[in-house]
Design a protein with these regions (language model features):
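Extracytoplasmic gate region of multi-pass secondary transporters
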Residues: 68, 266-330, 388
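Conserved MFS/SLC helix-loop-helix module at the cytosolic interface between two early adjacent transmembrane helices
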Residues: 98-138
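Structural signature of the two symmetry-related core transmembrane helices
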Residues: 115-129, 342-357
Length: 490
């Protein structure tokens, strides 16, 4: 005996029919857009969005590196840092960043993300300037903690912003554009410190001037970001009405969503249960565990007999190598689709080699080999770029401690090198498991689509040669788990 459907079932069916109708309408509208029109739109997006994001990331990395430069220009002596003090100063930045992640994730889903990010940029610029006013370990440690807290939201927010404006195939190049500023910042930041270090008759210590200058520039960049960065495709001041519509439809057809100022607790629960989310966590953890070399590289080089000025100059090639590897991570998958995971595994070998060289090379007679090892060991930004692109493309929906690097181990920092080597090996394993998991999930969804279990194609809904991939309404806020027509990018 057939049971009568209840109100909830009828409501769900009506919502499904309405969603299908909206998807079909959006696809018909999008098919009327020529490739030339879409390319012109993307160029327009790039001209406005990429410079804003690139400048912010440049200053974020400069602010992170400033402690590295200051360490060889008298900071440790002036503030009377001893023992593990400097290691704790480095660590507290990451403690602050860790403490900020959950409140930042909540606020990003409740507030307009671009305004939220702009305000945090201004705040962290102000905190960076306070580093120039520190008088001892305690004030420096507190400032570093709050600097990490203020900066914690930027990289996750930039991943979301990228996915809110660009189609999945466009993510690697755009992520590489702003992440590659880390290499540029490494070069220009060292030259800036070299110039400040050579200045005569300064009324304050030179390392204090570095913090004041970089912090002031960061705060100014935050003001520009607040004013110039639009919230989403529907509010882009630099696009006309037609272009805003096309920009929104692109996301719908590509199974994306735009910024929604609301927190979805169900998506949070889903994320905590999804194995791939924990793989992203492992990627971030492994990369983060290796980043102290970025803060200690100047001390490593300086500890092997180089002057502060020589230390700034011999570190420049490290920025260039970082820049090149970031673009390798972006361009190889572009020309050879489906190779992003394998490219990332290969790029892990660069810092793995550097960490191994730093650990194993003799101290005498191999000075340049040790310098080169710091260049290679610090090339973690390419893995950050690649992992960030994976998250931007494959996650839908809206919603440490460094005591291994201790003074007693200087200048080689043996425990830190061993930790880095272990982290890179763990990251390679994580990438391999992740690649296997998404290939398996895609194959499962293809099989279910072939059986008619999930609708995957439209265009008469008959799956013929003229059928095209169905889009999802841009306001649907379906996650990658809920949207069974979604396919993960390998």
């Amino acid at each position: 005996m057939a049971t009568k459907p209840d109100d909830a079932q009828l409501s769900a069916t009506a919502e499904e029919l309405e969603m299908t109708k909206k998807q079909d309408e959006e696809h018909v509208a999008f098919e009327q857009i020529s490739p030339e029109e879409e390319r012109a739109l993307v160029r327009k997006l790039d001209r406005v969005l990429m410079p804003l994001m690139a400048f912010v990331y440049f200053f974020q990395y400069l602010d992170k590196q400033s402690i590295n430069y200051a360490s060889v220009f008298g900071l440790r002596k002036d503030l009377r840092l001893t023992g593990q003090d400097f290691s704790w100063v480095i660590s507290l930045f990451y403690f602050g960043q860790l403490c900020s992640e959950y409140p930042a994730a909540y606020l990003m889903s409740r507030l307009p993300i671009t305004l939220f990010v702009g305000v945090t940029i201004i705040i962290w610029g102000g905190v960076e300037m306070t580093l120039g006013a520190t008088r001892d370990f305690h004030t420096l440690a507190a400032a570093r903690f709050f600097l990490g807290f203020a900066e914690g939201a930027v990289s996750p927010a930039f991943i979301i912003i990228t996915s809110n404006w660009y189609r999945r195939r466009e993510h690697p190049i755009r992520v590489a554009t702003w992440v590659s500023m880390s290499g540029v910042s490494q070069i220009l930041g060292a030259l800036m410190m070299y110039g400040i270090g050579g200045a005569k008759e300064m009324v304050i210590e030179k390392w204090r001037a570095m913090f004041l200058l970089s912090g002031g520039l960061t705060a100014a960049c935050g003001v520009v970001f607040c004013v110039m960065m639009p919230r989403d495709t529907t509010m882009a001041w630099f696009l006309n009405e037609r272009e805003r519509k096309v920009a929104t439809l692109r996301l719908a057809v590509d199974r994306g969503t735009r910024d929604r100022a609301e927190f979805n607790s169900k998506q949070m629960t889903e994320a905590l249960k999804q194995p791939m989310v924990w793989m992203y966590f492992m990627m971030a953890l492994c990369i983060t565990l290796t980043t102290p070399i970025l803060k200690f590289s100047s001390l490593v080089v300086n500890g092997f007999g180089y002057s502060p000025f020589q230390t700034m100059l011999v570190g420049l090639p490290g920025g260039a190598i970082s820049f090149v590897t970031i673009w390798v991570a972006a361009l190889v998958p572009r020309f050879f689709p489906g190779t992003r995971v394998y490219t990332s595994m290969g790029l892990c070998l660069v810092p793995l080699l550097g960490s191994t060289m730093l650990l194993a090379l003799p101290a005498k007679g191999y000075e340049w080999g040790i310098v080169a090892s710091t260049w290679l060991a610090a090339c973690c930004s390419s893995l950050l770029s690649s992992s960030a692109a994976m998250m931007a493309s494959n996650v839908k929906g809206n919603t440490k401690k460094s005591v291994a690097w201790t003074e007693s181990d200087a200048p080689r920092y043996t425990k830190g090198c061993i930790l880095s080597i272990a982290s890179w090996v763990a990251l390679i394993v994580t990438y391999a498991v992740y690649g296997f998991a998404i290939k398996k999930e895609n194959a499962k969804r293809d099989r279910l689509a072939g059986e008619g279990r999930y609708e995957y194609m439209v265009g008469g809904h008959d799956g013929g040669e003229q059928a095209v991939q169905m889009g999802v309404a841009v306001d649907s806020d379906l996650t990658d788990v809920q949207d069974k027509a979604f396919r993960y990018n390998l």
